[in-house]
Amino acid sequence: MITFNNLGNLGRLANQMFQYASLKGIARNRGFEFMIPPASAFGTRDLMVKQDGTNIYDIFDLSDNNYGLQVNQVCMERMHTFDKELFNNCPDNVDLLGYYQTYKYFQHIESEIRSDFKFQTDLFETCSDFMKVNFVYRDVISLHVRRGDYVSNPNHPLQTVEYYQRALEMLPNLDVIVFSDDPDWCNAQEIFQPDRFSISESNTVDADLCLMSLCKYHILANSSLSWWGAWLAKSEKIIAPKNWFGGDCVNKSVSDMEFGNWTWL
C-alpha cells in the first residue's frame, strides 16, 4: 500500500490533481494498492488550501478509492522532471511526498484519470450552459493570467502583456475567455478589448477550471491550473511561457510538462 498522506496539505487544487494522478499512476505501474487521505484531512496543515476552500473532493467524484492515513516511510520526489527510477522501482509501503508535476507518471492510465477528473454534474452543466449561451458552439481560446501570490514571488515570474500579445498572434480572430485571480488588472489592460475578450467572473477555481476544459485552444500562465485546463480539454493548441520559473528556481526544467501540440514562447 503506497500513500500520499500530505495530499490536501501540499498545494491547492491543481497540485492535488498532479499528486493524486501520479500516486495512482505509480501504484498501477508497480501493481500496488494505494490510499488517499479523507476529505476531513484536507487543509488541516496548509493555510492556502484552507483559505482557497476548493479541493479535489469538492469537484470530482473520487469515491472509488481507499481512504485513510497509514504510517509509511517517506519517499521524497528527487527532481522536478519525470523520475523514471522512481516510476519503475518505487517500493511498496512508502508515502510519496512532492509535487510530481508531469503527466508521464499517469499517461499509461490516462483514461482512468480522465474518468476520475470528471466534473460533478451541477458544475459541468452550469459551465456548459454558459458556453452554449455566450459562444454558441464557437471555438474559444482559454487565456490564463496568474498574479496573486506571484506578484511578490520571484520564483514564479509574472507573464508580460507582450507574452500574451505574441501568443494571441498565433491564434487570431477567435473569441477569448480570460481567467485570472486578478480580474481588475485584466480589465485595465488595453489588450483585452471587450469585442473579443471576456473576463471570467466566476470567482471560483472550480468553475474556471471547468470552463477552461471546455475551450479548444489554451494560452497558459506558468501555472498548473491552466496546464490542467488544457489537458482536460485535450487542447488542439497550447502556448506556454518559457520562463515558467525564475529566481532560485530559474534552472528547473519543465520539459516533462509538455504534451500535445505545444509551443513555448
Question: What name fits each language-model region?
Answer:
Residues R30-F42:
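A short beta-strand-loop structural module common to alpha/beta enzyme folds
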Residues G8-F18, S152:
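A short, glycine/small-residue-rich beta-strand->loop->alpha-helix junction that serves as a flexible
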Residues T3, A39-M170:
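Secretory-pathway luminal glycosyltransferase catalytic domains
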Residues Q16-R28, Y164-E169:
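Histidine-anchored nucleotide/phosphate-binding helix
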Residues E33-M35, S142, D175-I177:
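A structural signal for isolated positions on well-ordered beta-strands in alpha/beta enzyme cores
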Residues L10-G11, A39-T44, Y100-K104, R146-Y150, ...:
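Short, solvent-exposed loop/turn segments at secondary-structure junctions
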Residues E125, G247-L265:
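Leloir-type glycosyltransferase catalytic cores
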Residues L13, L171-P241, G246-V254:
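Donor-binding and catalytic core of enzymes assembling or modifying cell-surface/extracellular glycoconjugates
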